[in-house]
Amino acid sequence: MDEWLDIYDEHQRPTGRLRRRGDPIEPGERYLVVTVFVRDSGGRFLTTRRSPQKAYYPGCWEVTSGTAQAKEDGSAAAVRELAEETGLAPGPAAFHYLGRLEHPTDGQGGIFILDHFLVQLPSAAPAIRMQPEEVADWRWRTPDEVEQLCR
């Protein structure tokens, strides 16, 4: 089944145009991506290793992230992506909006609009149910360990 993405303008507003996921993006086009930082009650963050079958950054460690589908805002995309990739479903009220950035896509001329969220879990290290097409492994890490991954 095809996934469709909303295209945004330079003011980060939907244009009404759609693009099929995986189709080339035009220079200057923007689409919405979310990242979800999940912290357990011990202060550790959930990191996941991308599946080796992923087209971009296979096998790399990351926090939960994904592309918003057409007609989906950042909050809804964050809730969906976290549930799909990890099995965690703390409910929309647990998602705290951290802010928005823009970042160029890798060599495509387009631009990611990145909405960042934090989820604070009430317990330490709950069980994770990985989505094998997306996630190959997972690990809870201290803030210092996460910082080391980013270097």
Predicted regions and their residues:
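A glycine-rich, hydrophobic loop/mini-helix early in the fold
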Residues: 33-65
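Acidic, metal-coordinating catalytic segment for phosphate/diphosphate chemistry
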Residues: 1-35, 41
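A short, polar/proline- and glycine-enriched secondary-structure boundary/capping micro-motif
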Residues: 26-28, 56-62, 139-140
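A generic fold-level signal
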Residues: 31, 40, 55-56, 109-112, ...
